[in-house]
Amino acid sequence: DEQSGISQTVIVGPWGAKVS
């Protein structure tokens, strides 16, 4: 998350968890 200063974002959707 950019607001948290973390370069890694985790997106959770119908397909499951995705790390980009």
UniProtKB/Swiss-Prot annotation:
A GO term, aspect molecular function: carbohydrate binding
Record's keyword terms, sorted: IgA-binding protein, Lectin
Similarity remark: Belongs to the jacalin lectin family.
Function, in words: D-galactose-specific lectin, binds the T-antigen structure Gal-beta1,3-GalNAc (Thomsen-Friedenreich-antigen-specific lectin). Potent and selective stimulant of distinct T- and B-cell functions. Shows a unique ability to specifically recognize IgA-1 from human serum.
Quaternary organization: Tetramer of four alpha chains associated with two or four beta chains.
Protein name: Agglutinin beta-3 chain
Lineage, highest ranks first: Eukaryota, Viridiplantae, Streptophyta, Embryophyta, Tracheophyta
